[in-house]
From Swiss-Prot:
This is Atypical kinase COQ8A, mitochondrial. A motif (KxGQ motif) lies at residues 245-248. ATP binds at residues 309, 327, 414-417, 462, 476. It is a single-pass membrane protein. It holds the Pfam family ABC1. Its EC number is 2.7.-.-. Residues 298-487 form the Protein kinase domain. Disulfide bonds: none annotated. InterPro entries: ABC1_dom, ADCK3_dom, Atypical_kinase_ADCK, Kinase-like_dom_sf.
Length: 619
């Protein structure tokens, strides 16, 4: 039956595409109503089919059992109640200041129940502002509880703690069963088809863009309209897990890959994941830490201050007074990696959202492996401790302590760090921003060529700058991986050749690394070498490189179509995460308009690399 469901999703997509092709002319002549009726009928059939499958959970589990057997996901899937938990919109917690007295009372009462036992966690500190790497827009409305907290904070000389969860985030139960998650993707497939029809209708009824504006790589399909992007965001924020992780990866791409309007919407994916109801959250904690986990804490805030793809983060205070951040994994996420990735790739493939040359099968395998590692919080704790040891004497970076007694397979607790994420660093002086970026790039080179052990997630919120100590805390080590010497030996020579302006060297080393086969077209070879040379310009410049003024994005954009269409083999598996980290580090430098000397930095890394090896380059 699960196979029938997937066939249904694909069939609906093909139906939508066929209607688009055959009825475009009728749209121009006023046939919009006919199109809407066709779409509504398709949606009705889909919803009826999904309802027929409601009682068939076992067959779906059998369908995906063979996929699970290929991966070592030892945590058992939890049996949570199937009744849907009522969603709690942000407006029901943070009321508008102009609401009536009766409504005010009822909402304040609900909020009081939600935060029962809450104490201001920052009242013991003075003159200290903490940020929680989420959407930082203000929240309207003041309750009696807010006023009381403000008074207490004023008496203690500190600012009150403020929830930084995005206003768009809603309290919604995580779909735990595979059938429940599949139904959400089925609804998304239908919605995308309807949205595509509507987009074609709008485009056919308005004049074409004559401004000659360049389209982004993922901006060529009616399935990727703004309305459909909204549908994607809503679904990803609800199901979370592997699907949401891909949306977060899209959110950190620049405008050359994603239309700026779509990028803004996908940015919400990074900041606006829904969060678990209290009942589901506490059950997850009790399952992992035992029923008496609260006895180890003086305070635990039941509303999370951050919600991401795999888990949500809560503020707590231990009995010894230390403030900690408790990351709780969403139930069922680890067990649903295979089905989530398959379902999402089906939706993206049918909507033509994946450009040619991405090698989806290879990409799927890489995503599965990375997500399986990120769901293992015991492994992440080990990675954090290893990085803490590697950077123990670093004057600028540090790693917060892991709290072992409150950590497990699905719960990771670390000390809470002060400061703010780098996306709020734009107001700092340019000299300070240059120093931050220089340290980030230097750390990136050390991770790859000295440690051969890299945290590969370049999310802004994984770098917290504390202006009081002038240090940066490094967070989130779930995406940490190692690199073999056989890989770094060749990769460092590719960068060296690019920095030296040696095109033949770039080509030779690229073939050795299996970026190219040696049988590509001349156009493909030139595009690949050009891209590497462009990326190596920062390490070639004798003068400080101006990341804010560089045209790297535009020039790489012009090469992407050729590389996607004429690539013969997928790139090395290691480069997916490596280039995500390096590209993200360059993007941070660009956003902060950094102007730093990188040539000396790379030459020092190159010299140290080979001096620490038994053999020299090309030996």
């Amino acid at each position: 039956m699960a196979g029938d469901m997937l066939l249904l999703m694909r069939g609906l997509a093909r139906l939508s595409q066929a209607v688009i092709e055959t009825q475009a002319n009728s749209l121009r002549s006023g046939g919009v109503q006919t199109m809407q009726m066709t779409a509504e009928q398709a949606m009705g059939v889909a919803m009826q089919k999904i309802q027929e499958f409601t009682g068939s959970q076992q067959s779906v589990s059998d369908f995906s059992a063979d996929m699970d057997s290929k991966y070592d996901f030892t945590a058992s899937e939890q049996n949570f109640e199937s009744a849907a938990h009522g969603g709690l919109d942000s407006d029901s917690v943070f009321r508008d200041a102009n609401t009536g007295a009766a409504n005010t009372y009822s909402q304040a009462q609900g909020k009081s129940k939600l935060f029962d036992g809450y104490k201001d966690p920052t009242s013991q500190f003075t003159g200290h502002t903490r940020s929680y790497h989420q959407d930082h827009s203000s929240v309207g409305g003041i309750t009696a509880e807010d006023i009381e907290k403000a008074r207490e904070a004023k008496q203690n000389g500190s600012k009150p703690h403020k929830q930084m969860l995005s206003e768009r985030a809603r309290e919604r139960k995580v779909p735990v069963t595979r059938l429940g998650r599949l139904a959400n993707f089925g609804g998304l497939a239908v919605g995308l088809g309807i949205g595509a029809l509507a987009e074609v209708a709008k485009k056919s009824l308005r004049s074409e863009d004559k401004n000659g504006n360049k389209k982004a790589v993922l901006d060529s399909s009616p399935f990727l309209s703004e309305a459909n992007a909204e549908r994607i965001v809503r679904t990803l924020c609800k199901v979370r897990g592997a699907a949401l992780k891909l949306g977060q990866m899209l959110s950190i791409q620049d405008d050359a890959f994603i239309n700026p309007q779509l990028a803004k919407i996908f940015e919400r994916v990074r900041q606006s994941a829904d969060f678990m109801p209290i009942k589901q959250m506490t059950k997850a904690l009790s399952n992992d830490l035992g029923p008496n986990w609260r006895d180890k804490l003086e305070m635990f805030e039941e509303r999370p201050f951050a919600a991401a793809s795999i888990g949500q983060v809560h503020l707590a205070r231990m009995k010894d007074g230390r403030e900690v951040a408790m990351k709780i994994q969403y139930p069922g996420v680890a067990q649903s990696i295979n089905s989530d990735v398959n379902n999402l790739m089906t939706v993206l493939s049918m909507s033509n959202a994946l450009p040619e040359g991405l090698f989806p099968e290879h990409l799927i395998d890489v995503m599965r492996r990375e997500l399986a590692l990120e769901c293992d919080y015991i492994r992440e704790a080990k990675c954090a401790r290893k990085f803490k040891e590697l950077l123990k004497d670093h004057p600028f970076f540090y790693v917060p302590d892991v709290i072992s007694e409150l950590s497990s397979q699905h719960v990771l607790t670390t000390e809470l760090v002060p400061g703010f994420p780098l996306d709020q660093a734009e107001a700092l002086t340019q000299e300070l921003k240059n120093e931050i970026c220089k340290n980030i790039l230097n750390l990136c080179l050390r991770e790859l060529f000295e440690f051969r052990y890299m945290q590969t997630d370049p999310n802004w919120s994984n770098f917290f700058y504390d202006p009081q100590t002038h240090r940066v805390a490094l967070l989130d080590f779930g995406a940490t991986r190692g690199f073999d010497e056989s890989f770094t030996d060749v990769y460092i020579e590719i960068i060296k050749a690019a920095a030296d302006g040696n095109r033949e060297g770039v080509l030779k080393q690229s073939i050795d690394m299996k970026f190219l086969t040696g049988y590509e077209s001349k156009a493909m070879v030139n595009a690949h070498v050009d891209a590497v040379m462009i990326l190596g310009e920062a390490f070639a410049s004798e003068e400080p490189f101006d990341f804010g003024a560089q045209s790297t994005t535009e020039r790489i954009h012009n090469l992407i179509p050729v590389m996607l269409k004429q690539r013969l083999i997928p790139p090395p598996e290691e480069t997916y995460s490596l280039h995500r980290k390096m590209g993200g580090s360059f993007l941070i430098c660009s956003r902060l308009n950094a102007k730093i000397s990188c040539k000396d930095m790379f030459e020092a890394a190159y010299s140290n690399y080979w001096s620490g090896r038994k053999k020299g380059p090309s030996q």
